[in-house]
Amino acid sequence: MLSRLFKAGEKVLSNLVSKKDIYMASRNQEKSPKVQELYDLCKETFTGKAPSPASMAIQKLCSVLDSVSPADVGLEEVSQDDDRGYGVSGVSRFNRVGRWAQPITFLDIHECDTFTMCIFCFPTSSVIPLHDHPEMAVFSKILYGSLHVKAYDWVEPPCIITQDKGVPGSLPARLAKLVSDKVITPQSEIPALYPKTGGNLHCFTALTPCAVLDILSPPYKESVGRSCSYYMDYPFSTFALENGMKKVDEGKEDEYAWLVQIDTPDDLHMRPGSYTGPTIRV
């Protein structure tokens, strides 16, 4: 009798252990939110210095970033018939047309000493002017919409014009090479820029309502020299090369521009918003 009770008890205990194992296994198999996976990868990858573009970790990060959808970060795609507010449109400073567009909304997902995760929500025609990312790497995912990107890298060694009477008040001007001048969508390859390659200086113009998920490493930090500077671009023909400067190949002048640092543009209108996606476990 006792032996049968012991055997029955062992069977019940075995069933309980089996069910617990199944439950724990199912819990372990549950996928973390995509934004959590992205955060965990950023935490593993970034050490405080701009990463190498050839690293396997960066390739993995870009792969995960590319899979993020608006719903993964608490967004819904905005109708193309969005309201208009203050702003300008056009991809060139010489042919932009005055137009009303709402302010750009900035959503802060996470920021620490080594990286920033954030979202920019653009109404149609809104613009983030040409700006830089000193000693930083930036990875961007277009979540929805169409965005025009124009990007430059500095010509090395530096080619700087310090005197020119033709354009008063616009100097010094530094030569940069055009890296990108195109429209990107959610189907586009992840734009990745680095301190000296990939288009470290870029400007955005929203052709439709759109949202961009950005990862920056390391973050902007003025106290250590990583402050955001804005620029105006001028055609290569605006200034004459000074003696001793490296010549630009004939017929390729359109691939270069002179960049002049300016104050933060008055028409840059940005407002903070609330991130409503999954909470990140830090």
From Swiss-Prot:
Protein name, per record: Plant cysteine oxidase 3
Catalytic function, reaction form: L-cysteine + O2 = 3-sulfino-L-alanine + H(+)
EC number: 1.13.11.20
pH-activity profile: Optimum pH is 8.5 with CGGAIISDFIPPPR peptide as substrate.
Cofactor stoichiometry and binding remark: Binds 1 Fe(2+) cation per subunit.
InterPro entries found in the cross-reference section: PCO/ADO (IPR012864), RmlC-like_jellyroll (IPR014710), RmlC_Cupin_sf (IPR011051)
An example Gene Ontology biological process: detection of hypoxia
Functional note: Catalyzes the oxidation of N-terminal cysteine residues (N-Cys), thus preparing the protein for N-end rule pathway-mediated proteasomal degradation, upstream of the N-end rule enzymes ATE1, ATE2 and PRT6. Controls the preparation of the group VII ethylene response factor (ERF-VII) proteins for degradation via the 26S proteasome N-end rule pathway. Acts as an oxygen sensor that controls the stability of ERF-VII proteins, which are stabilized in flooding-induced hypoxia, and regulate transcriptional adaptation to these adverse conditions.
Organism this protein belongs to: Arabidopsis thaliana
Record-linked Pfam families: PCO_ADO
Binding site for Fe cation: H131, H133, H202
UniProt cofactor(s): Fe(2+)
Similarity section: Belongs to the cysteine dioxygenase family.
Keyword tags: Cytoplasm, Iron, Metal-binding, Nucleus, Oxidoreductase
GO CC terms: cytoplasm; nucleus
